[in-house]
Amino acid sequence: MSVIVPIHGPAIAPAPAPERVGVLLVNLGTPDSCDTKGVRIYLREFLSDPRVIENQGLFWKLALNGIILNTRPARKAKDYQKIWNHEKNESPLKTITRAQAEKLSASLGDRGHLIVDWAMRYGNPSLRDRIEALVAKGCSRLLVVPLYPQYSAATSATVCDQAFRVLRELRAQPTLRVTPPYYRDSAYIDALATSIKSHLASLTFEPELIVASFHGMPQAYIDKGDPYQAQCVATVEALRERMGVADDKLLLTFQSRFGFDQWLQPYTDKTIEALARKGVRKLAVVMPGFSADCLETLEEIAQENAEIFMEHGGEEFTAIPCLNDSDAGVQVIRQLVLRELQGWL
């Protein structure tokens, strides 16, 4: 009589769950509160990133911890308080980015294996938390969407840095894709042109010209090879062509300079002051590099620069809203996402 001896081997792993795909929208960041403490926490994280401030040597650390974080947070907190969404107790950037994710999810329809989420590079919800949450929900593939039309090492690249930093700690890593910049994508340019024309049509005055203001950057970063400036120029050139306006009717400037180094020029505030001094009385400003309204658009441009214009002779000023969670704005993101999800859906 033969005897069958059972062979005890390693347990067979269960079949993998159906693959899910995560889409993660990422914007720059925001403090959790508009008080000095909240802004200090945010600025510490932001200004400690070597992609933002490349020289993180002893002098910078002493300046950051000894001077900047003891003076700047109180001033910036007052600015945040001017534009804060008090109903939700959060910054407009957080409100809008959440809405962008929700509307994108709805526009993609009923796809049970597709999950749309959102995060901030600095502050909350953090990239780490949201990537870990998507993985916990079964996402084996992840599309990270930096919401910056123009690429910069200080924006898009640091999103990639942080995403891979999180993945480095995971044993079962999701496959990762990152959307490219979309600075002259036809859907983006069309949406900008339509938004500008629609806003101008709603005004009781006709601006003499439009200033296209982008976030600034140290000139040294461009000299090292960052393509940001060239992509900003390409956006404005495409927008001029799409709108049929002359170069001197749609100007390119750079805002939000910080510190003592030379930044990209011409500067927005100096340009707006000069225009008013030269006799321009009616002005519009659009911020094509911002996918959502934030401190730099709602306070710096719509309030500070409006005051500069009026103080030097201007009479009518308008800040054109960003694309935000408008139908056209969400459609830009949707087209970008669907293009990069090819082969995964």
Curated annotation (Swiss-Prot):
Its EC number is 4.98.1.1. It holds the Pfam family Ferrochelatase. It catalyses: heme b + 2 H(+) = protoporphyrin IX + Fe(2+). One of its GO terms (cellular component) is cytoplasm. It is an enzyme of class 4 (lyase). It is found in: Cytoplasm. Its main location: cytoplasm. Pathway: Porphyrin-containing compound metabolism; protoheme biosynthesis; protoheme from protoporphyrin-IX: step 1/1. Fe cation binds at H215, E296. One of its GO terms (biological process) is heme biosynthetic process. PROSITE patterns: FERROCHELATASE. Keywords: Cytoplasm, Heme biosynthesis, Iron, Lyase, Metal-binding, Porphyrin biosynthesis. The keyword Iron applies. GO terms for molecular function: ferrochelatase activity; metal ion binding. It comes from the Bacteria. Catalyzes the ferrous insertion into protoporphyrin IX. Belongs to the ferrochelatase family. This is Ferrochelatase. It comes from Rhodopseudomonas palustris (strain TIE-1).
